[in-house]
Regions:
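Glycine-rich phosphate-binding loops of nucleotide-dependent enzymes
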Residues: 1-201
Length: 201
């Protein structure tokens, strides 16, 4: 996502080899990362968190001011599109559930032009219902044409929404597999280090 330079390999974006010097470079190329901590401010409103420094303005020149009405309308509409009813967009984000906050962060990234979403453990701290809401939105985002990279240790969340899987073990790739070639049980065994355990027996 631009924070670290790769030790090896290449990053190809739309057929061109690309080097990111910062997260801003990645964002400019349409690659957005939603981190596990979400980068949300609990005491700020839903709208303020949605725009976070990119608020719509009204007026001219030095007399520009934050267009609160437009911002509230956009935030409510975008959240509504994913099935989350924000009755009052001025409410503090801290009053929302974990799943709603996760969807807010993802919806924000998409609104600002993300072509590829990198999601870092988006369901790790969520209950069953909240996790299902987030996973449904991930499927919806992927179906709309976005590229989605879901980073998770939970095979029960990864398998239903994934098309291909890259398995990492201690920082090394164990391979990339298409869903049609890999059962849920096989994926679970590889993630749990099952193949290494088999070699010890």
């Amino acid at each position: 996502s631009g924070v670290h330079k790769p030790d090896e390999g290449e990053i190809i974006v739309e057929g061109k080899k690309t080097v990111f010097d910062s997260p801003r470079d990645a964002l400019d190329m349409g690659i957005a990362t939603v981190y596990q901590d979400l980068a949300l401010v609990s005491l700020m409103s839903v709208t303020r968190n949605f725009f976070m420094g990119r608020e719509p303005m009204k007026g001219f020149g030095p007399f520009k001011t934050f267009d609160v009405k437009k911002a509230n309308s956009i935030a409510s509409e975008r959240m509504g599109q994913i099935g989350i009813d924000v009755r009052d967009p001025s409410q503090a984000v801290g009053t929302m559930s974990g799943g709603e906050r996760q969807c807010l962060a993802i919806s924000r990234a998409i609104y600002f032009g993300a072509k590829v979403l990198i999601l870092d453990e988006p369901t790790s701290a969520l209950g069953v219902h909240q996790a299902s809401v987030v996973l449904k939105y991930i499927v919806k985002a992927a179906s709309s044409g976005l590229g989605v990279i879901l980073i998770t240790h939970n095979v029960h969340h990864a398998y239903p929404v994934g098309n291909s899987f890259t398995i990492l073990n201690r920082g090394k790739s164990m391979g990339t597999f298409n869903k049609k070639d890999l059962s849920r049980e096989k994926l679970l065994g590889m993630m749990a280090g099952g193949e290494e355990l088999d070699k010890l027996e």
